[in-house]
Every structure is written in C-alpha cells, then in structure tokens.
Amino acid sequence: MGFRINTNVAALNAKANADLNSKSLDASLSRLSSGLRINSAADDASGMAIKDSLRSQANTLGQAISNGNDALGILQTADKAMDEQLKILDTIKTKATQAAQDGQSLKTRTMLQADINRLMEELDNIANTTSFNGKQLLSGNFINQEFQIGASSNQTVKASIGATQSSKIGLTRFETGSRISVGGEVQFTLKNYNGIDDFKFQKVVISTSVGTGLGALADEINKNADKTGVRATFTVETRGMGAVRAGATSDDFAINGVKIGKVDYKDGDANGALVSAINSVKDTTGVEASIDENGKLLLTSREGRGIKIEGNIGRGAFINPNMLENYGRLSLVKNDGKDILISGTNLSAIGFGTGNMISQASVSLRESKGQIDANVADAMGFNSANKGNILGGYSSVSAYMSSTGSGFSSGSGFSVGSGKNYSTGFANTIAISAASQLSAVYNVSAGSGFSSGSNLSQFATMKTSAGNTLGVKDETAGVTTLKGAMAVMDIAETAITNLDQIRADIGSVQNQVTSTINNITVTQVNVKAAESQIRDVDFAAESANYSKANILAQSGSYAMAQANSVQQNVLRLLQ
C-alpha cells in the first residue's frame, strides 16, 4: 500500500460514516423521546400528510360525537317534559270520565272543571318553559334543527319537536248531521280514511224496528273505529216544547207500532200516568219516557232506533208536530281534526245528505276549557234543534195577567195558572229553512218587542216574523255537562295521541343519533389507529435502531482514531 500524509482518506471516510451515524442516532433519540415516528416533514413527507388528514378527521369525529350527545340531551329533556304532560292529560281524561255520569251535579262538575283548568295551565307552563341553552323546545319553534354528526360538512341529522300547548294539541273533529224525520236503507262509506283508501260499511236500515236505526249504524262504525279512526254516537230524543199540562191521549195512541191507548195525565204528569204508560211497553218499543228538570216530556230511544208517535199524544205533552216521527241525529268523531269525508246512498236518511245542514267543528284542548260556542256545541251533538230561518209563524204571542194575579186570559194563545187554556197554542206551525249561520236560541232579531200597559200589572207581546233566525245556544265550559264531559274525553284522548306521536318521533331521532354516535365512535377509533400506525414510533424497532447507531458511533470513533494513528507509520520511513 502507498503512504500519503496530505490526504488522510481513511480518516475522512471514518468521519463521513460517523456523521451519517450521528444523524441516525439523533433521529432515533428524537423518536424515542417524542414517541413519534414523524417529527418533521423530512421524516416522511407523504406519511405526514396522511397522518395530518387522519388526525383532523379523528378530531372532527370527536366533536361530532359531542354534538350528538348535545342532541340527545335536548331530546331527552323534551321527552321527560312530555312524559309529565302525558300524566297531566291522563288526569284530565280521568276527571272528564268522572264527570261523564249523571250522578254528578253542576256544582261537582264545576269543581272538576276547575281542576281541569289548573291542569291545563300547568300543561301550558311546561310547554312554554321547557328549554335547553335558552332554546324553547315545546313551543313549536324547534323545527328542522340540524346537528352536525359527521367528519364532513352537511353530514347532519334533523330534529323537530311539535308544539305541546293546549291550543295546539287535542284537535278533534266533530260532525253532526241534521235531525232525521224519514228513514230508509243507507249505504255509508268513509272516503280516504287513511289518506288513500275508502271504507264501505254494511248497509243499515233506519227505522223503528229492533236492530235498525242510528244505533245499528253507530255500532257498525264503531266496530271498525280502530281501522278508520272515526267513531259514532247517536241521539234519538223527542222532547216537549213546554212543561206537561193536564190532558189525555187518544184511544189509538201508539209508539213504534205498539198501542198504548188512552191515558189521562195531570200537570207535570204528577200522577205519573203518561210516563208509566209509555214505559210499560218500553222493552217492545225501545222508547223510554221521563220528565226532565223543566217539567217537559222526554222520550228517549236507548237503542238508537226511531221514535214514531201515532194517534194523538195530547196537546198537554207539547210535542212539536214535526217531531212525531223522529230518527234522531248521528254524530261522528275523528281524532285528527281533519274533515270526515263520506259518500254513499240515501245519506239523507242519516242526516248527511246533500240538502242536510251538517254541523262541523274542529276543537283543540284549550277550546274545551271555556264556554263552548253554539256551532261547536251543535257539531258535538249537544242539541237536537236544527239551524235554519223562520219562514212564517205566529203574528204575535200575547200574554196578560191581571193585577189580582188570577192567571192569563183565555184565548191568549198560551196560558198558565188555573185557566189551563192552551187550546190555541198550536194554531199555526213554524216552518224552517236551511241557513248557513245560526244565532243563539231565543235571539229573535227582527220584529220583536215587549211593552207594558198602564192599567195592567204585566203585559207582554212578542212578534215572530218571517226571516228571524233560529238556532242552538252556547253551552257551558268543558265537563260541566254530560255531553261536554264526553267531548273532553275525546279531546283528551286525541291530545294523548298527539303527544305520543311527538314522543315517538323524538324517540326515533334519539335512536338515530345514538346509532350514529356508536358508528362514528368506532370510526374515530379506527382512524386514530390508522394515524398511530403512521405517526407513532415502534419502540421495539426504534430501540434496536438506537442500539445499532450507538454501537456504530462508538466503533466509528475508534476507527477514526485508528485512521489518524496510521499516518504515524510514515515517520519510521524517515528514521
């Protein structure tokens, strides 16, 4: 080998290798101290880009999980609030059921209504105060609210919570047909009962026979109510226009074809002769008689078949001639507030024909709290009077009482007291025509007036002219009447269904959000694992690399020392 001293190639090679090994040792120490395989872009440029993308995705998924948990918190808050509202509605329905029996007096029903009013106030209070982070949840404004639950934009879930105030829930549809005076065979069909299909009921005969009438039709409708959502009730009542006065029926007096014969009865049917005679055959006729709180005769068909009075019941019963044949009124209830669409044949025989006046109303829970409007009351089937206009009637109805109080004068048209002269009471009949609107009962708007005479203690005249309106009266609030209590039961049931539907929707969204959170949690773990594979150092492998670099550093130092000492051998050649 040659000996050169100007250029120590061996030492230079040793130094170069030592420099490279020093860099490897530095990198290894950096990885071991940080725990990261990539500490700078120079370590792995493409790997750094991938791991940064994965880290961003993992962090975003973590926030998405937090968003989802916020959504769950909101939905659970609303759900628990509505659970309390449902308990309130259950109590309201229970109290309405308690009021729906004639063992209750007006006083006790009024107390029950007061309880219901308080419950409604609390229900509304819950609806108006339930909030999350200042956002109202049950007021109806929490609609189409979005929650980002993905790593990329617009990966959202939407949540809506319907309004739960008493004015927004319980919307129930009530429809009642006109009073029926002519029977016949009826084919009744509910149109689009589920939004698509029609439901055709079995044919029903409206008559006075057993197994016929509105009762039979109501049974047919109600046994399919779970499918159609429509329920039916009926009212078949014939009521006198005034308190019963002494009189007698004719020898051929009969109800629904069953002969009762002659009956002498007293004022108010004090001896019970008229009621007893009618009730003696009630199992055959299906008609039960009673005297109401105003002393009027009330005939009721419990089974829903018609009431047909034949012969002469006597003027003392004050039965309107137009009511001698009465098949009642049919009322329909639907628990969604939408119109009840019907079709069929001979619908006039159930009061729902083209020419019939049908009362219709949709009522919310809150509306049942106050006085029930006359139109709504009629739609609920409160009244048996029909809407219409008076076309003609008495030119005047006058009453006179002397200062001695001896009673009304003979020939006055109506009389009370000892005279009992009511022979001219029905000299004229009143004709009714259809009208689009109705007034409160007894509100005679035209040609009416009262005057008092100077020499008479009491004198009154009221003219009933053609064109005057006739209708039904407003009803008292909620459960203060039997019919009202029944209606509140229907409305409360609808409100419960409404809240259950809202809660079901919330539950569906909760399940959706929970599933999404579970999914993105797994995704986040997998993304972090992938990032770790790229970014984090393998301590076992890196420890081996460090040991190698450390040994090479030591051996390199020895080699460099030896390379420098080799040049000393040149001195021996110069000795």
From Swiss-Prot:
GO molecular function annotations of the record: structural molecule activity
Record InterPro entries:
Flagellin, Flagellin_C, Flagellin_C_sub2, Flagellin_hook_IN_motif, Flagellin_N
| Role this protein plays | Flagellin is the subunit protein which polymerizes to form the filaments of bacterial flagella.
Q: Choose one Gene Ontology CC annotation of this protein and give it.
A: bacterial-type flagellum
Mark the sequence repeats by their residue spans. Answer: 405-409, 411-415, 447-450
Among Pfam families, the record links this protein to: Flagellin_C, Flagellin_IN, Flagellin_N
The family annotation for this protein states:
Belongs to the bacterial flagellin family.
Q: Which UniProt keywords apply?
A: Bacterial flagellum, Repeat, Secreted
Protein name per its UniProtKB record: Flagellin A
Q: According to its UniProt record, where is this protein mainly located?
A: secreted
- Assembly with partners or alone: Heteromer of flaA and flaB.
**What is the annotated localization of this protein?**
Secreted; Bacterial flagellum
